[in-house]
């Protein structure tokens, strides 16, 4: 979606918590609906990655990814990991997710895959460490806030050796703040019901 950086476009964010705009790839204009497929996992900056991370970072252009990581201080990817406050980053992800949601007028479905859940994401250029949480299942929803909240709640119910390590990381990095900020923007709710499809 962002093969031509000169064609990036900006989405304004209403009532921002941290960032006032989101920068996305030009080809995003070609779509008025989408399915967001996410592999739930830990993340070294955001605590965890799920639907909201995919909706924010995943849809951002290269400049937009830096913009979110730096909480509106820079569009330069080389500066993207230098000293951003953890609450600023997780708030920026919640802000950015709202811009894409409202651009699509809610025409988005979300799938979170909870298999091979690792504490870390391989987006940092290294292989994720060994999985220490058993496979939980797959969730689908039209609510990005509810699906991420439900995913984390299901991880909390596991008793595997890696569960506490991941949950401590999410807490330390203020990961659930992304869910809170997205809910504040009105793109979903943390209230949910789980229904089996089989």
Regions found by a protein language model. Give the residues of each.
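Extended, low-polarity segments enriched in aliphatic/aromatic residues
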Residues: 1-198
């Amino acid at each position: 979606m962002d093969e031509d950086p000169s064609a990036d476009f900006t989405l304004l964010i209403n009532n921002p918590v941290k960032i006032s705009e989101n920068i996305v790839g030009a080809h995003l204009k070609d779509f008025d609906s989408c399915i967001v497929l996410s592999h739930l996992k830990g993340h070294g900056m955001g605590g965890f990655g799920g639907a909201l991370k995919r909706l924010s970072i995943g849809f951002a252009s290269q400049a937009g990814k830096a913009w979110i990581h730096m909480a509106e201080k820079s569009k330069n990817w080389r500066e993207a990991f230098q000293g951003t406050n953890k609450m600023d980053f997780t708030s920026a992800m919640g802000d950015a997710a709202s811009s894409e949601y409202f651009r699509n007028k809610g025409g988005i479905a979300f799938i979170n895959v909870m298999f091979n859940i690792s504490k870390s994401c391989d987006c940092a250029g290294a292989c994720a460490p060994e999985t220490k949480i058993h496979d939980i299942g797959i969730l689908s929803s039209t609510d990005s806030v509810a699906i991420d909240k439900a995913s984390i709640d299901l991880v909390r119910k596991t008793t595997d050796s890696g569960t506490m390590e991941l949950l401590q990381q999410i807490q330390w990095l203020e990961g659930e703040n992304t869910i809170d900020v997205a809910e504040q923007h009105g793109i979903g709710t943390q209230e949910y019901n789980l229904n089996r499809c089989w």
